[in-house]
Amino acid sequence: MGQDGIALFCTLHPASSEKAERCINLLCTSAREYYRTPRANCTAWSYFTPFQPKKANSIADHPVICGLEIYTTKAALQSQVDDPVYFQRYHEIVKQENLYARPEELVAWYPAGGFLTRDPSADGEEDGVLVSVTRMTAKRSFEDLMGILRPFVDWVTKTEPNVFTYAIFSRPKAPRELLLIVRYKDRKALKGHLEAPEHTDVVEKLTRALESDITQSTTLWQEVPDSFVNHGTGDGKSRDASAKL
């Protein structure tokens, strides 16, 4: 995906655990039948629920579902909003069945660095894929954070094949904010990443450049089935080996 793409970070607030399951089922149907098709111009569709080690498949008492959708252009994003069969129908069902406790939150972000995926094996169809979401606010500038992260991205790319995604996003409306999405093959990949000396070093550097504690700004999630991340559009068969953002 090029620098002119647009990402939509979504936060959904289902009214109950049962309604959360209903939302996920509806979303997964759309992922299979719409978002993977060429007309969607969607390069990533990753939805996730809170990671709970003791009950990996359960949903929290106050359920929340988050997701990242990436489109090739703003026009592609608008096309899916206008789609009557999947997007608009989904929201009709949400309203009819009172699936949400409160309105969803949608925030637009723009690719700024890192990589979206590595190869076809990293398309999110595996079980157990974990996702970390970190929101950072720089003390001075976004570029300060990028200066710290760029060398680390290179290290992750070269040495951590089980880190499927390491994607950095910016937001013009909040120029000092940075969104970091990292997808891991499994718990082992997450553990190895967090315990690496290089990770410890980059966290220390970021801590000095951030307004708040980075450890309090990161949440961990488990990716739902039917999520996918690929470079390019269409049926997912045409992908770069290293999809740079």
Language-model segments: which ranges?
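Short S/T/G/P-rich N-terminal loop/turn motif that feeds into the first structured element of a domain
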Residues: 1-245
